[in-house]
Amino acid sequence: MLSREEQNRCFVPVRRILDNEDLKLFKEGDAYKLIDSFICDLDEAVKDKPISASIPQSSSIEHVLNILDRVGEIKQENPAIDNMGSRFGNPAFQSFYDQVYIETPKLHQVFGIEHNAAMEAGRYFYESFGNRKRIDYGSGHELYFMSWLLILKQLGIFTKNDYPALVVRVFVKYVELMRSLQIFYTLEPAGSHGVWGLDDFHFLPFLFGAAQLVNHKYLRPKHVRDPEILEMCRADYMYLGYVYFLNKLKPSVSLRFHSPMIDDISAVKTWSKVNEGMIKMYRAEVLGKLPIMQHYLFGHLIPASPGMSPAPQDGDDSEVTHVHSHYADCCGIKIPSAISAAKNNGSRIPFD
């Protein structure tokens, strides 16, 4: 466990990436190395481990799973409201978000950490479920969740022995929870590149999912085009499970048309190459993109680089000094997700 003195140096994280110069400093700094190393270490830890693998679960893993269970209960306590058939975000998400925010300090008591440390960890936690104002979710929020786990690791809650379970137990449960929230509240995609992106909402199921399959005897990237294999293997492998979900979400068109990037990747010969490519893509398209990283938060344990802009002083620090994306859904021009389209068309969403 991190010393009490060090924990008391923690503070509520704030934005510090306001322009391209700040992004450059981030990519050259300690925070980037911390995040990148953590993602790569988790990736290595989950290689050749299906979701059904027998993996030890520490009490810390159990605590996190229980916290996610509570978030699921909060969702049920804040039902979606009649949104007059709108395909955009349901306002009830804001009540859900507010309750998660209120309960965050209590949920962190189980870790026995100092107040300041809980405040630093807590902001990454509640921000990982989407944006309250825009009622959207994207890879930046997914990054907040990984940052929450990283903060807990920095505090000494997790060790490297926990890494396999952090992916195939905790992260898998988080993705399932987020999928339920996306459906329940019709969350909009944040920063979606549309059909030409990897996915409207998530990136890491593909990265970690490829790692799971690196040395598989029989399964190859081309098998994502085989519906029978997807059906048989979706419960054990994140990558295949996510493609299965996308196919069910968009049943009227082929993978080639609804997810051309995933279809292109299926031509790669080995999962090892896919995994290497996913890591490079994550660095370039998430950690290296200003429209995503301008919303990222820095505290004591994930520190801003020297020379970065000071935190915005007025208003909501997640909204002011916003740098515009070139995509249509930047700055409030709403784009409904495939999930909302499927609900609107009466398609059955494959989630219970």
Curated annotation (Swiss-Prot):
UniProt GO molecular function: peptidyl-prolyl cis-trans isomerase activity; protein tyrosine phosphatase activator activity
Keyword Lipid biosynthesis on entry: no
GO cellular component terms, A-Z: cytoplasm; nucleus; protein phosphatase type 2A complex
SUPFAM superfamilies according to UniProt: PTPA-like (SSF140984)
UniProtKB keywords: Cytoplasm, Isomerase, Rotamase
Keyword Isomerase: yes
GO BP field: mitotic spindle organization; regulation of septation initiation signaling
EC number in record: 5.2.1.8
Subcellular location: Cytoplasm
Catalyzed reactions: [protein]-peptidylproline (omega=180) = [protein]-peptidylproline (omega=0)
Function as written in the Swiss-Prot or TrEMBL entry: PPIases accelerate the folding of proteins. It catalyzes the cis-trans isomerization of proline imidic peptide bonds in oligopeptides. Acts as a regulatory subunit for PP2A-like phosphatases modulating their activity or substrate specificity, probably by inducing a conformational change in the catalytic subunit, a direct target of the PPIase. Can reactivate inactive phosphatase PP2A-phosphatase methylesterase complexes (PP2Ai) in presence of ATP and Mg(2+) by dissociating the inactive form from the complex.
Family: Belongs to the PTPA-type PPIase family.
PANTHER family recorded: SERINE/THREONINE-PROTEIN PHOSPHATASE 2A REGULATORY SUBUNIT B, SERINE_THREONINE-PROTEIN PHOSPHATASE 2A ACTIVATOR 2
Name of the featured protein: Serine/threonine-protein phosphatase 2A activator 2
Source organism phylogeny: Eukaryota, Fungi, Dikarya, Ascomycota, Taphrinomycotina
